From Swiss-Prot:
One of its GO terms (biological process) is proton motive force-driven plasma membrane ATP synthesis. It is found in: Cell inner membrane. InterPro entries: ATP_synth_F1_ATPase_gsu, ATP_synth_F1_gsu, ATP_synth_F1_gsu_CS. It is a peripheral membrane protein. F-type ATPases have 2 components, CF(1) - the catalytic core - and CF(0) - the membrane proton channel. CF(1) has five subunits: alpha(3), beta(3), gamma(1), delta(1), epsilon(1). CF(0) has three main subunits: a, b and c. The gene is atpG. This is ATP synthase gamma chain. Transmembrane segments: none annotated.
Length: 291
């Protein structure tokens, strides 16, 4: 029964793995709900900042703020690449990196260089492995990242845009659609689009004029940074919700596969045991007949 013992050992091994994947599935489900709630709570702030900034930009057209310049010749681009710090989340990071690298290659074919800020160790390792120009990064952000962890890398990139050392900035991340679907997204963060500060931007429901202290221009300059930071944080929240959803689905699939493997191994074990019993009975019958 040496074969039978080996099969039982395999069954116990798969059962232990199944317990781990089941626990990871449950943890991911809990974390996904929390990240979804954080994502939902962050939206009203970002929308209100965008509305006030749009109102100020439309009433102060001669603002002279570099971050609001809309037309530039593109010579150098920046990327904010958001990925997860951990794996076991299906093809989530691979899909984002595929979209990101395709855009980088397209720019390189035009002779345009890139500068990259990475949030998440998976994206950072991928960029370093192929020799891309990573200028700043932040990893090990945890389940509830603080804005302070993002400010250093973001400030450096925004300052380079203000100095005309970078002419466009892309934001790349995994967008959360629903539990079963996450999609890689690439958005132009800078220059800020017409849908944010142009005629198609959201309008305030009130028609009266506002009085700003110290000045409308000072408030606008402050709000532009806060708006950009809120967009990046919202993308990070989306990416984290996508990560937990993808991990939950991946761990459920692994748990189900482990269950199927256990069933197959039990069937093989029962067949081998039945064959061994049949052989023993045949030997007993043959021995009795010989006597």
């Amino acid at each position: 029964m040496a074969v039978g013992k080996e099969i039982l050992t395999k069954i116990r091994s798969v059962q232990n793995t199944q317990k781990i994947t089941k626990a990871m599935q449950m943890v991911s489900t809990s974390k996904m709900r929390k990240t979804q709630e954080r994502m939902r709570l962050a939206r009203p702030y970002a929308e209100k900042v965008r509305m006030v900034m749009s109102h100020l930009a439309q009433t102060n057209t001669d603002h002279g703020i570099p971050l609001l310049e809309s037309h530039r010749e593109i010579r150098r681009v920046g990327f904010i690449l958001i990925t997860s710090d951990k794996g076991l989340c299906g093809g989530l990071n691979a899909n984002v990196l595929k979209k990101f690298l395709a855009q980088v290659q397209e720019y390189r074919n035009q002779g345009i260089e890139e500068e990259i800020v990475c949030f998440g160790s998976k994206g950072l390792m991928a960029c370093q492995s192929i020799g891309l120009n990573v200028v700043a990064s932040a990893v090990n952000l945890g389940d509830t990242p603080k804005m302070e962890m993002l400010l250093g890398p973001l400030t450096e990139l925004f300052q380079r845009y203000e100095k005309h050392e970078i002419d466009r900035i892309h934001l790349v991340y995994s967008g959360f659609v629903n539990t079963m679907r996450q999609e890689p997204r690439m958005e132009v963060l800078l220059p800020i689009g017409e849908n944010v500060i142009g005629d198609s931007a959201p309008k305030s429901p009130f028609s009266w004029e506002y009085r700003y202290e110290p000045t409308a221009l000072a408030v606008l300059e402050y709000l532009v940074r806060r708006y950009l930071e809120s967009v990046v944080y919202q993308a990070l929240s989306d990416n984290m919700a996508s990560e937990q959803a993808a991990r939950m689905v991946a761990m459920k699939a692994a748990t189900d596969n482990a269950g199927n493997a256990i069933k197959e191994l039990r069937l093989v074990y029962n067949k081998s045991r039945q064959a061994a019993i049949t052989t023993e009975l045949s030997e007993i019958v043959a021995g009795a007949a010989a006597v």
